[in-house]
C-alpha cells in the first residue's frame, strides 16, 4: 500500500510490478487534477477502484470516464453513493435498473452504496446486499468499502467477486 502525492510517485507505482490495484477518490479533491490522475491510472494495467471525488470529478463529462474504462483490458470498479450515481448516470428509474444500466454503460462493476447496497456487472448480473444497516450512512464508511474492494482485488479475486464479498463483509 502506498499513498501517491506526485507524478514521480505515480510513475513509481505504475512501474512496480508487485502492485496490481489502485484506489483513487477518498480524500482527494474534485477537479481537473483528479480527472488527470484517474485517466492516467485507467491507461495502466492496474485494476482500478474509483470512489468519491474520483467519480464526482467527471460529473461534467462522464463519457470521458466511460470511454477510458471501455478502452482498457484491466478491471475497473465504481463504488458510488446515490449522489455520485445521479451525477454520472442520471437519476430516473428504479434503483436496480439504474445500477444495471450504469454498469453496462460504463463497462465497470458498479457498487451503489446504501442500506441495501447493490452490485452490478456489465453482463447484467446484479445482487442486493441484505446484510446492510443504516449505520453505513456514517461519513467515511464508503471509503472503508472501497478499501475492502481494493484489498480483495489485490488478492486476485475477480472484480465481481471482490465487490460482492466486500459489500457483504462491510455490512
Per-segment meaning from a language model:
Residues 88-89, 127, 138, 159-163:
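Extended hydrophobic-aromatic, low-complexity segments
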Residues 146-171:
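Conserved post-catalytic alpha-helical subdomain immediately downstream of the catalytic base
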Residues 1-131:
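Glycine-rich phosphate/dinucleotide-binding loop and adjoining beta-alpha-beta core of small-molecule
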Residues 134-136:
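Glycine-rich phosphate/pyrophosphate-binding beta-alpha loops
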